[in-house]
Amino acid sequence: MSEKAKKPQKLKARLPRGFVDRSAADIHATNEMVDKIRRVYELYGFDPIETPLFEYTDALGKFLPDSDRPNEGVFSLQDDDDQWMSLRYDLTAPLARHVAENFNEIQLPYRTYRAGYVFRNEKPGPGRFRQFMQFDADTVGAAGVQADAEMCMMMADTMEALGIARGDYVIRVNNRKVLDGVMEAIGLGGEDNAGRRLNVLRAIDKLDKFGPEGVKLLLGPGRKDESGDFTKGAGLGDEQIEKVLFFVGIKDYAASADDLAKLVAGTSKGEEGVDELNTIGALVSGAGYDATRIKIDPSVVRGLEYYTGPVYEAELTFDVTNEKGEKVVFGSVGGGGRYDGLVSRFMGQPVPATGFSIGVSRLMTALKNLGKLGQVKPLAPVLITVMDGDVESMGRYQRFTQALRAEGIRAEMYQGNWKKFGNQLKYADRLGSPIAIIQGGDERAEGVVQIKDLIEGKRLSGEIEDNASWREARVAQVSVPEAELVAKVREILEHQAEDVRRAAEGR
């Protein structure tokens, strides 16, 4: 008895963990937001560039290319010349490589913006993805803090261009140099204490997560979490901890500025950092940005390990409900700062740089919560239905379609099984088509087309119960000569747009 041939096993369709498919609505909303951001950047004189998704792993900075497989945090592969390449994890490291490689050709200051996907080889979770979009702007080759002040002003203008009202956002500014001065003042200056300074930076980076008491433990002996795991602390004494917490706990910079200046007095970096903060404050104030929009705030601690001078963060201050049903402040949607060391890694000479990055997906969530994004959906295409399948008729339907497109009207000729006309109208309904164009043999003989207003037809069918009222209402289907097709379609679309405007205004 012959063995039955085994059926080939179907390949299971599955999305990789930490990645998402994006719908048309999501893409349209992203494009709408990115276009608004781009317009602000270009008003400031920034121009676009684009770098590849892949870079040599050593160019990304954080990761060692000589490990067996450099996949800690990045997705990597080995090229045919045995060199490791990795998907970019941000847009800044590729910019640094680009600037260094083209340094003799580019014009400094080099002001650019970039939007694109970045990749993180990390454990995915709720709201934590392995691929997401960032939108960056950077100035390379400008050492003065006026470049940092301009970045803060551009961030503020970007928030407002996106429809976020004053009072619903704030750009918060700190300076890494001031913290360096604080650490020097408490006895952690010099190369011998580099490791302890790094531990302090990592401890205060947890301020939002653990609060002052949690950070106090991490600055001191250490902290045990709820699971019982123990994180060794930086080993500072009580007086040292008090001074660090004073600095990161400042809420009113103007009221605490004198005390901060005294704390870092005699430390070159600390005094320089305070001067830079004061200068940024004066520059933005002189340009008309008050402290409700751009605020000097030493509690900004994210990225202090990475940045070399001013650090800034765009925070949305309105409340949202989290997954636990609790009211929380929405929080950060972007940030940046001065990173004078990144380009210099390739150059052997100092190259100042400053910039910021917007988390596109997170900001898009905020804008949807505010009703500022995705409210105006792109108009679905006019559907040209197919009544007859002969070549002559098909050519005529295609001509109608092209005539509409030539006048800037989205149009689509039905490509499914044309013999079931009811399915064509169902398709138009699912698509959200505003109008259907119909021409059978009788209409073709007369040189006319039927234009069906699908939106008006749907409204009438829901509101009118008897045939008499239907006939007296605005006509939902009209017959016009072929030559008047485009003009009549445009007229109906304008009526529909006016109805939408009236509805939005409550009229």
From Swiss-Prot:
The keyword Aminoacyl-tRNA synthetase applies. It is an enzyme of class 6 (ligase). GO terms for cellular component: cytoplasm. Its EC number is 6.1.1.21. Pfam families: HGTP_anticodon, tRNA-synt_His. One of its GO terms (biological process) is histidyl-tRNA aminoacylation. The keyword Ligase applies. It is found in: Cytoplasm. It comes from the Bacteria. Disulfide bonds: none annotated. One of its GO terms (molecular function) is ATP binding. Keywords: Aminoacyl-tRNA synthetase, ATP-binding, Cytoplasm, Ligase, Nucleotide-binding, Protein biosynthesis. It catalyses: tRNA(His) + L-histidine + ATP = L-histidyl-tRNA(His) + AMP + diphosphate + H(+). Signal peptide: none annotated. NCBIfam families: hisS (TIGR00442). Belongs to the class-II aminoacyl-tRNA synthetase family. Homodimer. This is Histidine--tRNA ligase. The lineage of its organism: Bacteria, Pseudomonadati, Pseudomonadota, Alphaproteobacteria, Hyphomicrobiales. The gene is hisS.
